[in-house]
Swiss-Prot record:
Binding, 5-amino-6-(D-ribitylamino)uracil: F11, A42, L43, E44, V66, V67, I68, N98
E.C. number: 2.5.1.78
PANTHER family: 6,7-DIMETHYL-8-RIBITYLLUMAZINE SYNTHASE, 6,7-DIMETHYL-8-RIBITYLLUMAZINE SYNTHASE DMRL SYNTHASE LUMAZINE SYNTHASE
Cited function: Catalyzes the formation of 6,7-dimethyl-8-ribityllumazine by condensation of 5-amino-6-(D-ribitylamino)uracil with 3,4-dihydroxy-2-butanone 4-phosphate. This is the penultimate step in the biosynthesis of riboflavin.
Keywords in alphabetical order: Riboflavin biosynthesis, Transferase
Disulfide bonds: none
A Gene Ontology BP annotation from the UniProt entry: riboflavin biosynthetic process
Catalytic residues (UniProt): H74 (proton donor)
Name of this chain's protein: 6,7-dimethyl-8-ribityllumazine synthase
GO molecular function, one term: 6,7-dimethyl-8-ribityllumazine synthase activity
Transferase keyword on record: yes
Length: 140
């Protein structure tokens, strides 16, 4: 059994609830433990994961959040920089599944967040589990 930290950027409560439920269900189905940490926004997710990874309390991480395109350039910054930060941590050997949705509208986000539909929270958790298995295989 491994311990995972689900780090959620809580902005759209109903969508986040679905993403977290999907991630938690996928982790528990494999016999893993899950804890949830909430941060203000998607840009804070990589930093929170980096801090949590320092103490070795968790074996892997699931990044959760929803970024919906608005009328300004802010969407591109948040979507790109949060993904870049997560990728950089993954390249450093931290097992992270990225479940931060970047969509054009709320309907697309709902389709992807709902565990009964596309279940992107569950997919992100499964990705984190897969990366943790690779860590074990390669002794990282």
């Amino acid at each position: 059994m491994a311990r995972f930290l689900i780090v959620e950027a809580r902005f759209y409560d109903h969508l986040n609830d679905m993403l977290v439920a999907g991630a938690r269900a996928a982790l528990e189905a494999e016999g893993h433990e899950a804890e949830v940490l909430t941060v203000p926004g998607a840009l804070e997710v990589p930093g929170a994961i980096a801090m949590a990874a320092e103490n070795g309390e968790f074996d892997g991480f699931v990044a959760i959040g929803v970024v919906i395109r608005g009328e300004t350039y802010h969407f591109e910054i948040v979507a790109g920089e949060s993904a870049r930060g997560i990728l950089a941590l993954t390249m450093d050997g931290i097992a992270i599944g990225n479940g931060i949705l970047t969509t054009e509208n709320e309907e697309q986000a709902l389709e992807r967040a709902d565990p009964a539909r596309k279940d992107k929270g569950g997919e992100a958790a499964k990705a984190a589990i897969a990366l943790l298995k690779l860590q074990d295989r390669f002794g990282a």
